[in-house]
Amino acid sequence: GGHHGNASQHCANAIHQLAYTITEIHKLASPMPGAPEDFTAEALKARGIVDAGQFIPQNTVNVGVIGSTNDKISVIPGDAFCEVNIRCFSTAEQARIDEEIKALADKVVIAGTKVSITGGMVTGPMEKTPQVQKMVDIYKAVVKEEFGGEVNEWVAGGLTDGNRTAKFIPTLDALGVENYDEHTDHESVDLKTAVPRTAAFAITL
């Protein structure tokens, strides 16, 4: 870095390069289904849609953190970084995104800068295999026979221990109690769902 007024001619702006790199990262994301306001919980409920997960794109990309050691607007930043979160529904898509992001290290637009990519995919997706479908069918049959209920099969973009176990064994997830406002300080559960869901899980086993 250097002084913006006196050293622009021999300094390279790392944040400027990072802006280009972030733009390229977001180009890898699957297109969204439409205007965000049409897919809030309230909007979907008004349309009678139960499975909100069906609208989650094949992959989602989020540059959630950016930064630099520079804290003065009169100084050309010599470093900058970002942290990226990627979610995919298939291992093939995950591998493709990983490869394309790493290739961005060679995509330097601002002369005098360089791009370094560190890290990688940490946890795999929980793919729906034929074995998983068989387990889903068994669980649905148990709920119908024992409680006369119907199971809404959801797709979700979150991350749980199920993502880790799915790498080794067929896995069903989210069979616990109904909850609301997850990851907030006012998260709550519906206790009326505790007994039937626990019983259905035990019978399935």
Residue positions per predicted region:
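Metal-dependent amide/peptide-bond hydrolase catalytic core
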Residues: 1-205
